[in-house]
Regions:
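Alpha-helical, largely C-terminal catalytic domains
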Residues: 1-361
Length: 361
C-alpha cells in the first residue's frame, strides 16, 4: 500500500518535506486527487511487472509498492477509464525500469548492450505486435504497453505518440554519450534535452486517451493549451532536478540543471539550488495564469454543436489533469523509495534494480 498513507481519499496524511524542498503553494493550492481505481491499479501493475519479468520477484515483493509508481499516475490521470489508466500505469512502471537499465548500462559501461536495446525499442515502437515475445523482457514489456495504448486511440494519435517516443529514445542515447564521456551540457542544451528525457510530450499525449478524445491539431497546438501543458511538465522536470541535485553531484552525474548552472554559469551549489527553485516557483505562478487562459479557451470551443461540446469537455479534463500533475509529482518525490537514497546500503546502487548485465544477453 501507499497512496496518501493507506488512504483512498484526497486528504492525505502529511509526509515530512525537507524545508529546502518545501513548496507551500503546492501543499495549499494544489490539493491531491486519487483515481478510485488505484487499489486495483497497484495490484495489477505489480502482477504485470512479475509476469513480464521486468523486476525479479523478490524485488517486486519488497520494493514495488514503496516505489509508488502507480500512485504517481493515479494522482495525475483523473477521470481516465480504468483500462486506460492501467495501460498508462504499466507503461510508466516500464519507463522507470527502462531508466534504471539505461543507468546501469552507463555505470557498468555497456555501450553495445545499450545500442542493441535502443534499436530494438525503435523497432518495437513501430511494430509492437511483432515484439510481444522478444527475448529481452524490457522489449517485450514495452511492446505489450504499446499494443494496449495504441488500441485506445486512432492511427493519427498513435503516429504522433510514436514520433514523440522515437525522440525520447534518441535523447536517452545523447544522455548515454554525455554521461560516459563526462560531457556537461550547457544550460540551454540541457533544457532542450530534458524536455525529451523527461518525456514532456509523452505524458501530455496521454492526457487525450484519459479524456477519451484525440484533440484536433489546432486545439492541441493552441498557445493557451500548449503553454499550460509545457509549464506542468517543466515544473515536474525541474523539481526532480532540485530533489536529485545533491545525490547526482555525489555520484559524478552530468545531467542536472544545477550541474549545468555550476559548470557553465559559474554558480555555487547554493546559488544553483536557489536558481532551480526560482524556476520551479515561476512554473507554478505561470501555470496559474496559463490554466485560466486554457479554461477560457475550452469554454470558447463549446460552439453549440455536439462536437464542440465534446472537445471543450476534453480540453477541460486535460487542463484539470495538468494541474493534478503538480501535486502528484511533488508528493511522489517525498513518498517514493526511489528518492530515499539515505536509506540505501550503497548510495550508488538502488536496492530495487537488477545490477546484473541484463543487456549483455
Amino acid at each position: 500500500m501507499h497512496a496518501f498513507s493507506h488512504s483512498t481519499t484526497s486528504t492525505p496524511t502529511a509526509v515530512p518535506v525537507p524545508p529546502s524542498l518545501s513548496l507551500p503553494v503546492i501543499e495549499a493550492a494544489f490539493p491531491r486527487q486519487l483515481h478510485p481505481y488505484w487499489p486495483r491499479l497497484q495490484e495489477k501493475t505489480r502482477t504485470w511487472l512479475l509476469e513480464k519479468r521486468l523486476m525479479p520477484a523478490d524485488k517486486v515483493e519488497e520494493y514495488a509498492d514503496g516505489l509508488c509508481y502507480t500512485d504517481l499516475m493515479a494522482g495525475y490521470y483523473i477521470g481516465a477509464p480504468d483500462e486506460v489508466l492501467q495501460a498508462i500505469a504499466d507503461y510508466s512502471a516500464w519507463f522507470f525500469v527502462w531508466d534504471d537499465r539505461h543507468d546501469r548500462d552507463i555505470v557498468h559501461y555497456r555501450p553495445a548492450a545499450w545500442r542493441r536495446l535502443r534499436f530494438r525499442l525503435h523497432a518495437a515502437l513501430d511494430a509492437p505486435k511483432e515484439h510481444l515475445h522478444h527475448g529481452d523482457p524490457l522489449v517485450a514489456g514495452f511492446a505489450d504497453s504499446m499494443v494496449r495504448l495504441y488500441s485506445f486511440m486512432p492511427r493519427t494519435w498513435n503516429m504522433r505518440f510514436a514520433r514523440h517516443f522515437h525522440a525520447v529514445i534518441e535523447a536517452y542515447d545523447r544522455e548515454f554519450r554525455n554521461r560516459t564521456e563526462g560531457i556537461i551540457p550547457t544550460v540551454e542544451e540541457y533544457l532542450a534535452l530534458r524536455r525529451l528525457t523527461f518525456a514532456h510530450w509523452i505524458w501530455t499525449d496521454l492526457l487525450e486517451p484519459s479524456a477519451e478524445l484525440e484533440l484536433p491539431d489546432g486545439v492541441r497546438k493552441h498557445p493557451a493549451y500548449r503553454r499550460a501543458a509545457l509549464l506542468s511538465q517543466e515544473f515536474a522536470a525541474w523539481y526532480n532536478d532540485l530533489c536529485s541535485l545533491p545525490k547526482e553531484i555525489a555520484g559524478d552525474e552530468v545531467h542536472n540543471l544545477g550541474i549545468s548552472l555550476i559548470k557553465h554559469e559559474g554558480l555555487t551549489l547554493e546559488e544553483a539550488v536557489t536558481e532551480i527553485r526560482r524556476r520551479v516557483e515561476t512554473c507554478i505562478s505561470g501555470f496559474l495564469d496559463a490554466e485560466r487562459l486554457a479554461l477560457e479557451f475550452a469554454d470558447s470551443l463549446a460552439d453549440g454543436t455536439v462536437r464542440g461540446k465534446e472537445i471543450a469537455a476534453a480540453v477541460r479534463a486535460c487542463v484539470c489533469n495538468m494541474r493534478n500533475w503538480f501535486s502528484s509529482v511533488y508528493w511522489f518525490h517525498h513518498e517514493s523509495g526511489r528518492y530515499m537514497v539515505d536509506s540505501w546500503d550503497d548510495r550508488s546502487t538502488p536496492p530495487y534494480v537488477n545490477n546484473e548485465a541484463a543487456g549483455e544477453k
